[in-house]
Regions:
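Flexible active-site lid/hinge loop adjacent to a nucleotide/diphosphate
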Residues: 2, 6-7, 12-98, 103-117
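Nucleotide phosphate-binding/pyrophosphate-handling subdomain across enzymes
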Residues: 114-189
Length: 189
């Protein structure tokens, strides 16, 4: 959704790392798409017009993990019962890392970016930190990058903020569930 289209990249070096956001639609039709690291985020009843049932939606998202090779890593939320149930039903090649979304005060102190006031962005950061450990990246470098993030236009974009009022442009949200997640991530709404 942001950055350069992967297929247009010309100078790919062997150690290049790509971060790819793939929807349940893309995963469903990506028979040969195999990752070294996979994260499944935002499990909520989305795209049911396509998948018909929540169960089918989860199965589609879980396809990302099922297609992984040996020695790959899959990161899931520790308390996500839907994915834990799917793990019981399916054999996987990857090592499953269950991520606790609790953010320590030590980590909170390193975040100098209002982008992470949003609970969902903070949860996503927790996954990034877990992958960074596996890649043996230094926290100092990770936080330097994290603290440089800018909000995307139309996606949870804070337009105005003071003590009494917060105006957010989230017109990129495609469904009620997505908008609800945003609202739940702020206090006093």
């Amino acid at each position: 959704n942001i950055g350069n289209p992967l297929l247009l990249e010309k100078n790919i070096k062997p150690k290049t790392i790509f971060v790819i956001e793939a929807s349940s639609y893309q995963i469903e039709y990506s028979k040969y798409f195999k990752t070294d690291f996979a994260i499944i985020l935002n499990i909520s009843p989305n795209h049911l017009e396509r998948h018909r049932t929540f169960k089918n939606y989860i199965k589609s998202k879980f396809g990302l993990i099922k297609s992984q090779k040996k020695n790959s890593f899959a990161f899931i939320e520790k308390n996500n019962n839907f994915l834990k149930e799917e793990l019981k039903k399916n054999k996987t090649n990857s090592k499953i890392i269950k991520v606790n979304l609790k953010i320590s005060n030590k980590i909170k102190k390193k975040i100098k970016n209002s982008y992470f006031e949003n609970k969902n962005n903070l949860n996503n950061l927790k996954f990034v930190l877990e992958i960074s450990k596996k890649l043996k990246l230094k926290n100092q470098k990770v936080f330097k990058v994290v603290n440089s993030f800018k909000e995307l236009n139309f996606r949870q974009q804070i337009l105005y903020k003071n003590k009494k009022l917060l105006i957010i442009n989230d017109s990129k949200s495609t469904n009620f569930s997505s908008s609800l997640n945003l609202l739940e991530s702020y206090k006093n709404i």
